[in-house]
């Protein structure tokens, strides 16, 4: 009937902490990296660590910790000082007390600290209480004065590396535009600090991909890659609000689906994520152009690391059923795999896709594979890649 007093020591065993760190490393997503500001170069001697989530151990544990013990959590500030303090001088000035803080008096102190640094590391996002079951928000912008903080830091002219800790995709387009790099860690957990520090300083290479679509603004929601096709198929590059002439005719914009003030593309598509290295996809080869319902489609392609770092790419396979008895999604993720490559290394990657996995429920609620034409993409995200085609026959 009593708690085993030895359990906490088991829970925070070295192997478990290492697993927590590995999970945080592999789930962090590099969304932007202009001029390869990351990983931080050896020429960087001073970093300014700012933001309300730079040293908030409870908040980085996430939504479902309940009675989690924050004393075992290592924050980014603590990790950077401990692991890289011998290489860089760390100046800490949070600017805001917590993520919902509207008090702007501390921003000037953060800006002063940033002016003394070579690079600014800004840790923003949302407290864990703002996410989770029954914790909905109508506004997905950064809470409090965090946007003002990022804007003020950007005015220093120093490169801003924005690290976002959050439980959902926030609408950070404005902040991303002001940042040289953006790393999205979600709520990274107990070992989030060391994981983020190693990613920033290049001991680890980002490999995470967006598990959801990031909208430009809340008006784009619902925004997801696997939406059904419609009688007005969406066009990615459409007329925006500023381009419409005065007294334009009602039919002048056509009949496709798009937002006049935002276009159709999201801020970041499903499956998106950058690396410190680059990858090249070779031509996709199919085992057959025509298959029967009991067949297995073999998909092969070459993947090459064309950059300077060893890295891991998450290669993704998408399929589209072009015509069905009911409306089908424009794309569906069917396979993905992590491929680790050294600089210059090339591997042949193989996906096996049984035709039976192309089944869906028809109007009679029968699970069926319908004959017809299909499109297939192998790509780095849900909006990339060249289409190849195959056919399913009876």
PLM regions with names:
Residues 310-317, 328-329, 362-363:
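Short, hydrophobic/aromatic beta-strand segments
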Residues 296-300, 346-350, 385-387:
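Intrinsic-disorder/low-complexity, polar/charged segments enriched in Ser/Thr/Lys/Arg/Asp/Glu/Gln
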Residues 325-361:
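Intrinsically disordered, low-complexity Pro/Gly/Ser/Thr-rich segments with frequent PxxP/GP/PP motifs
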Residues 1-62, 68-77, 81-86, 91, ...:
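Secreted, periplasmic, or luminal enzymes acting at the cell surface/secretory milieu
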Residues 354-394:
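Terminal connector regions
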Residues 144, 293, 343, 370-371:
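Surface-exposed loops/turns
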Residues 10-13, 91-178:
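Hydrophobic helix-and-loop "lid/oligomerization" segment in the mid-to-C-terminal part
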């Amino acid at each position: 009937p009593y708690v085993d007093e030895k359990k906490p020591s088991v829970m925070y065993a070295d192997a478990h902490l290492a697993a927590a760190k590995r999970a945080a490393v592999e789930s962090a997503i590099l969304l932007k990296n202009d001029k390869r500001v990351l990983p931080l170069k050896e020429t960087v001697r001073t970093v300014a660590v700012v933001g309300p989530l730079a040293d908030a151990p409870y908040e980085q544990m996430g939504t479902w910790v309940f009675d989690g013990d924050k004393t075992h959590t290592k924050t980014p500030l603590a990790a950077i000082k401990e692991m890289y303090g011998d290489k860089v001088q760390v100046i800490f000035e949070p600017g805001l007390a917590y993520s919902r803080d509207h008090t702007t008096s501390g921003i000037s102190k953060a800006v002063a600290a940033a002016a003394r640094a070579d690079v600014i590391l800004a840790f923003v996002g949302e407290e864990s209480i703002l996410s989770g079951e029954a914790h909905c928000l109508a506004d997905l912008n950064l809470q409090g004065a965090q946007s003002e903080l990022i804007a003020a830091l950007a005015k220093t002219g120093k490169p801003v590396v924005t690290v976002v800790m959050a439980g959902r995709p926030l609408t950070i387009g404005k902040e991303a535009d002001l940042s040289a790099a953006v790393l999205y860690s979600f709520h990274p957990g107990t070992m989030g600090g060391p994981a983020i520090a190693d990613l920033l300083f290049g001991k680890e290479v980002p490999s995470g991909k967006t598990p959801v679509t990031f909208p430009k603004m809340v008006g784009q929601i619902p925004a997801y890659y696997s939406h059904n096709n419609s009688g007005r198929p969406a066009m990615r590059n459409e007329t925006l609000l500023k381009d419409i002439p005065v007294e334009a005719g009602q039919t002048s914009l056509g009949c496709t689906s798009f937002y006049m003030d935002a276009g159709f593309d999201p801020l970041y598509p499903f499956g998106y994520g950058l690396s410190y290295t680059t990858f090249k996809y070779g031509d996709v080869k199919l085992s057959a152009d025509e298959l029967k319902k009991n067949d297995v489609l073999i998909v092969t392609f070459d993947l090459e690391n064309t950059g300077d770092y060893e890295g891991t790419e998450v290669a993704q396979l998408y399929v589209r059923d072009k015509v069905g008895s009911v409306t089908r999604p424009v794309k569906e993720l069917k396979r993905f795999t992590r491929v680790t490559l050294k600089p210059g290394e090339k591997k042949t990657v193989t996906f096996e896709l049984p035709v039976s996995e192309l089944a869906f429920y028809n109007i009679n609620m029968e699970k069926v594979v319908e004959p017809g034409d299909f499109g297939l993409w192998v790509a780095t995200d849900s909006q990339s890649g060249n289409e190849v085609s195959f056919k399913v026959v009876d």
